[in-house]
Amino acid sequence: MGNRSMGREDTLGVLPSLLFCKMLRFLKRPLVVTIDINLNLVALTVLGLLTRLWQLSYPRAVVFDEVYYGQYISFYMKRVFFLDDSGPPFGHMLLALGGWLGGFDGNFLWNRIGAEYSSNVPVWSLRLLPALAGALSVPMAYQIVLELHFSHCTAMGAALLMLIENALITQSRLMLLESILIFFNLLAVLSYLKFFNSQTHSPFSVHWWLWLMLTGVSCSCAVGIKYMGIFTYLLVLSIAAVHAWHLIGDQTLSNICVLSHLLARAVALLVVPVFLYLLFFYVHLMLLYRSGPHDQIMSSAFQASLEGGLARITQGQPLEVAFGSQVTLKSVSGKPLPCWLHSHKNTYPMIYENGRGSSHQQQVTCYPFKDINNWWIVKDPGRHQLVVNNPPRPVRHGDIVQLVHGMTTRLLNTHDVAAPLSPHSQEVSCYIDYNISMPAQNLWKLDIVNRESNQDTWKTILSEVRFVHVNTSAILKLSGAHLPDWGFRQLEVVGEKLSLGPHESMVWNVEEHRYGRGHEQKERELELHSPTQHDISRNLSFMARFSELQWKMLTLKNEDLEHQYSSTPLEWLTLDTNIAYWLHPRTSAQIHLLGNIVIWTSASLATVAYTLLFFWYLLRRRRNICDLPEDAWSHWVLAGALCIGGWALNYLPFFLMERMLFLYHYLPALTFQILLLPIVMQHASDHLCRSQLQRNVFSALVVAWYSSACHVSNMLRPLTYGDTSLSPGELRALRWKDSWDILIRKY
């Protein structure tokens, strides 16, 4: 026993010394950490940052569309609701993030282009994110070309073209969204290519999932910045669908494996983008909870969900409309203007300008402002009283009602008389008894459009209703036409008999509401001016607010169809247009959105060259003549699908758009052409040049071409950065096309 105990003690004493000796031997070896650094990527990133961040705060003045985006940033800083029909809110929130990081309080009057920024505006921070996005697009172009299996030299060529292209530099140095959109477009393409290339050797690995999910996230971000982002999203979805179709035909994969692949792609490329898109709007609506200048575009229910504004006015209103209720009725359509059902003592003219006669009854219009004459009383046709019973008797779907104008006590009426501006519809009026053979026709059936059951009650703000005339089945409708001077330019209201469905112009909702208690007219008039008393909460769900906001953004039309610098898609290809962004108030220094004409023209020629070569190869392959090895052919086809497809999807839809278009709309399409240009050059060198001499000559021509592109970029630099005041002669020398609008001061 004693020997065993001694043995244990010896062992315990030896173990620490053995461990110590091993640690000493470990420390004698050098600790080596290997890091692969692509110096090309580092150099391109540094150069991209230098070209985009250099003197970023200059000019310290509002440049072109900064006047609009700056307003939206101020709204975010002050939590004020706004509506911008140009795109979803993610891009605006990114710009606002720059303002928040710089400590911007939102106090600046964004009223004109060229206005000097006050000291409280962090110009550098506001322009930082677009500049970073523009800078990082340069190394991303390099990586995309590498992932397409072309050479490092070709990848460097694409990145350098992105680096020196003047229009891309200008657009990324300002508080604008195009550079951020291009960044996420390229990130979506790069992520998908990395995912696709990892498919063969490591499916379902961490990297595989990372790149697949990042593809969906990038696509969602692109769409969330501008609706134009959906074009690149469709490009990625199309290529992914083709690859998935090939995957289904792969007999080496089991059914479970194929199903797993398809589910992974569906989640990453469909579910994730939809979720993120909704998340952008959720954050947007959570931030903008205060009433703002665009409230009236939205429905009453939406307005009531905002702090202040209508929420303040409608706070405490009864929820259910009852017989005897005093209400204002707002048109749900909001087109051409948000307006309320209105009447006044003036009558329709006996004879209209076109010689037609009228009923000479009291005018009924839709008035785009709050007014005491917008109030109506919901009357039970079987009772004479205009007060609410105790307890109130709610109005339900299908009930017959009369609408009494609050200030004149005349009843809403329609009859078989043509409306003043819409002769195919009936005139709507408030009935005046002239003791002639024209009886009152003032009964209306309530139709709750968004009812859940036929027993639904008419609710303030929430219910969308139609008024169907009992005698003629005409529906109360806002025609949208402006009445002449005798109607004070207010909007025409008609009775529509040819209705095919519940159009928005026929739908109304109660915005302001109170229970009438006064038996005499003077008492009722006092009530119309008095505040409400009951408090009913009307918080809209997120999906209801999102649906309405999205619909308004898609259907809201800007009436400005012409602009000094608007252009057509055909002018973009040959760079026949430019945009003067900013002019120094005292010197001739100016900033223009003007592309590098060498790059733009060459990119268009490369697109034509690729298309011709592709169809030539395709025809020859049909004849079983393969000019390219299979690997080279597949790389050539994928490059064309991405670059030509990306260019076409981001360019051709503009021919179908009826809206103002500007040169910057072409920039996302241009980036895909720039990626294609060096690819076509490498293809020409590798497969079209037959001898080494031809390759050497072609390489020399490419170097000369790159030098000319750099020379043009340097010549246009004063118009890109706006930091140099040129003489009138120098400015005229830069006007290489008659269509370019270079600003020359007259001294």
Swiss-Prot record:
Predominant cellular place of this UniProt entry's protein: endoplasmic reticulum
Keyword Repeat part of the UniProt annotation: yes
Stretches assigned to the MIR domain: 318-381, 392-449, 453-513
Pathway terms, separated by semicolons: Protein modification; protein glycosylation
Matching InterPro entries: GlyclTrfase_39-like (IPR027005), Glyco_trans_39/83 (IPR003342), MIR_dom_sf (IPR036300), MIR_motif (IPR016093), PMT_4TMC (IPR032421)
GO BP terms: extracellular matrix organization; protein O-linked mannosylation
Reaction catalysis annotation: a di-trans,poly-cis-dolichyl beta-D-mannosyl phosphate + L-seryl-[protein] = 3-O-(alpha-D-mannosyl)-L-seryl-[protein] + a di-trans,poly-cis-dolichyl phosphate + H(+); a di-trans,poly-cis-dolichyl beta-D-mannosyl phosphate + L-threonyl-[protein] = 3-O-(alpha-D-mannosyl)-L-threonyl-[protein] + a di-trans,poly-cis-dolichyl phosphate + H(+)
Enzyme Commission code: 2.4.1.109
Keywords attached to this entry: Endoplasmic reticulum, Glycoprotein, Glycosyltransferase, Membrane, Repeat, Transferase, Transmembrane, Transmembrane helix
A GO CC term attached to the entry: acrosomal vesicle
Entry GO MF terms: dolichyl-phosphate-mannose-protein mannosyltransferase activity; mannosyltransferase activity
Family: Belongs to the glycosyltransferase 39 family.
Protein name: Protein O-mannosyl-transferase 1
Native source species: Rattus norvegicus (Rat)
